Amino acid sequence: MALESALPSLRELAGGKPLIGTSVQTQFGKLYTPEETNLLATQFDSVTPENCMKWQYLCPKEGVYRFEPVDLLIDFATRNRQKAVGHTLIFNRDGNYPDWLFRDGGKEADAKLVWQRVEDHAAKLMSRYAGRIDSWDVLNEFIEVPSPGYRVTDLTRVLGADYPERLFKIAARIDPKAKLTCNDFAVERPDRLKAILAFVRSLRDKGCKIDVVGSQSHLEIGDNAVYAALGINRVMPRPGLCRVRKLEAANPGVWHSIPYSHAA
């Protein structure tokens, strides 16, 4: 018997508290080697598509969706009794949505047309996987500090900086049973944590359903992520709803951190 088969898996050791997840790269229409596929199936409670659900990959041409890689991952999760995370409806960074989103023939699309496309995209994606994806990263990486407090993108330029409110309300209407996440990075930085908490609180005060704050944790030794998680829990409807969406920890003082981190 191989050593790894004699040891308990990560998901067995965690016992669901917390759920252990990983990202999966599937946009080329296949998973990994049999050994890697077995690790994905046995070690993790949840899987998240790394890129294939992002708008620019999923629908590079208007009306032409590439659902096959996403279907592959969702089917994989279903077979292995894993949760699947929807990542992401809107990534607030230029280059993370298709160019056609802002074009109307030979001219720039107005806000009305862009909103219609956003709503159509959310409906097509969330409706297709309703009941199979129970948690959606609705908005990814909106906050920027200092001023103006948000990352300026083509989306904020065309739709306005208040577009997240309408986006969350659209998502809640399409799939009322899904958990909705506001995802951001560097929550261990006090200035960013303060801005993220204020942003989430303001949206919830406006009637937005936000069940989870997701932390993309690109950490170095000494980052105080524990206090960041406690801070996030102050604004959530129930305790414990800060989820780590990404996690890597580096020690910049160790020259060999990259190969050793990779090996780990």
Predicted regions and their residues:
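Short, acidic/polar
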Residues: 26-43, 70, 115-126, 191-203, ...
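Boundary/entry segment of secreted carbohydrate-active catalytic domains
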Residues: 2-50
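Short helix-terminating capping/connector loops at secondary-structure junctions
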Residues: 15-16, 79, 131, 208
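Glycoside hydrolase catalytic-domain groove-lining segments
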Residues: 75-83, 157-183, 190-264
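Acidic-and-aromatic substrate-binding clefts and catalytic sites of carbohydrate-active enzymes
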Residues: 3, 23-34, 55-68, 143-147, ...
